[in-house]
Amino acid sequence: MKVKNPVIVFATGAGIILGALCFTASAHHGDAGRYDETITTLTGTVVALQLINPHSILILDVEDQEGAVVRWQAEFSNAAGLARIGWTTETLKAGDAVTIAGRRVKSGAPYINLSERARIFKLETCEDVYRSGMIFGDSPDYPAPDCSL
């Protein structure tokens, strides 16, 4: 079988490939305008760590200024990204005391993003267990918390 117009065949093939690439690229979402640029620091107790895709979740209880316990969610890297830097389900366990720093959602809900300019300190060992730069390349330089708590 002879191809009548190779330009049409090439253009069709290129269109299919570009369409597939655009579909893949659109699978992720932006968060422009969703989070405060100011860094929020919280100290609390781990309730659960969910190493899942597309974003892992750290759930922790934090005491507010009035002494009431507020349940916070912290969203960060996917399970594969965390595994590459040595994370397992044992890295943070229920009951661990942590200090986290990240960008809070603008709505004021108890939700924080740890994907960039973020850190997690495990207070028992005063260990810096997560910096967003470990995966994404930025390297926040926040001081370590007072681990004598």
Per-region residue spans from a language model:
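Bacterial N-terminal signal peptides
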Residues: 10-22
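Short boundary/loop segments of OB/S1/cold-shock single-stranded nucleic-acid-binding domains
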Residues: 25-40
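Conserved hydrophobic positions within beta-strands
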Residues: 44-46
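Short aromatic-glycine-enriched beta-strand elements
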Residues: 52-63
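Short, structured beta-strand/loop micro-motifs enriched in basic residues and often containing a Trp
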Residues: 75-84
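Short nucleic-acid-contacting surface segments enriched for D/E, G, S/T with interspersed K/R
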Residues: 84-100
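Glycine- and charge-enriched low-complexity intrinsically disordered segments
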Residues: 135-149
